[in-house]
UniProtKB/Swiss-Prot annotation:
Signal sequence segment: none
Localization per Swiss-Prot or TrEMBL: Cytoplasm
Modified positions (N5-methylglutamine) in chain numbering: Q233
Stated role: Peptide chain release factor 1 directs the termination of translation in response to the peptide chain termination codons UAG and UAA.
Annotated source species: Listeria monocytogenes serovar 1/2a (strain ATCC BAA-679 / EGD-e)
Any single Gene Ontology cellular-component annotation: cytoplasm
Keywords attached to this entry: Cytoplasm, Methylation, Protein biosynthesis
PANTHER family: LD18447P (PTHR43804:SF7)
Changes after translation: Methylated by PrmC. Methylation increases the termination efficiency of RF1.
GO molecular function: translation release factor activity, codon specific
Family label: Belongs to the prokaryotic/mitochondrial release factor family.
UniProt protein name: Peptide chain release factor 1
Amino acid sequence: MYDRLQAVEDRYDELNELLSDPDVVSDPKRLRDLSKEQSGITATVETYREYKNVNEQINETKELLGEKLDDEMREMAKEEFAELQKEKTDLEERLKLLLVPKDPNDDKNVILEIRGAAGGDEAALFAGDLFRMYSKYAESRGWKVEIMDANPTGIGGYKEIIAMMNGNDAFSRMKYENGAHRVQRVPETESGGRIHTSTATVAILPEAEEVEIELHDKDIRTDTFASTGAGGQSVNTTMSAVRLTHIPTGIVVSMQDERSQLKNKDKAMKVLRARVYDKFEREAREEYDANRKSAVGTGDRSERIRTYNYPQNRVTDHRIGLTIQKLDQIMEGKLDEIIDALILEDQTSKLEHLNDAN
């Protein structure tokens, strides 16, 4: 572990020199990439330097204890030695976590896609409830939410809704929401009071920048059509809606939320870039995931990850066996208790994998 930490510190010092190099300063892309790399290892280097400093103090205190001291001085040295040993242990644990490979997408913004699945109108209503839950959560964290496209049902639900979430750590926290969400409740239209089960799927995609995934015009087919509202009726006479097809992957994105064809195409391109990036990244991870199944699930959007039971005011996350009797609060966007537990489980699993590899 310490060889790796020393290598990280050496790289940090090298980056410091590079960032003051005129050739780097004059190259915006390289400057941004190196600054991002340095920012990503700063906490590790600072903690490692603190650890080395504590180690030096421990050695000095050991030497002091080997000398002839009066009782009071010896007692003080022993107390200091014990405190330093505890601090060293704490720093070692922090360093282990800091060495866990960071998801390169954690700092990215999020494209959120929610679709009503099994359950008809009730599934669409639940999709709407999930979107409102995530919107409130985003507000609590100071993130901005922008609806990019929506297919409302007319009864307060959505067959599909796509939104952009902009803010610090958005992907690092929202990525655990990928999967199928199940709801158990009595629909408002149910006169007999029977509990129905419906599902909605949630897709969390990191926003991909143009420099990360290049889409060539020759690989994209663009179709335009008239926008439609709930029920399928045409809502305008202009061909403002846009459908983009990425021919190599077959990925299709439609966008009709804006009255402007140009704005719809711009939004569709953002979603298309994110979906293509997500596809390539998933394929690259397949071999790794085959050797190590994540403690918090595979991230497959068909995987049932959570159940929301309204009659019992209960939410259960099936990946980590966590049950919370606070469904009313969860639906108001108070998701940190669940997400923090998922992050801890994920970090613990990665740390165990790291220890096994060593």
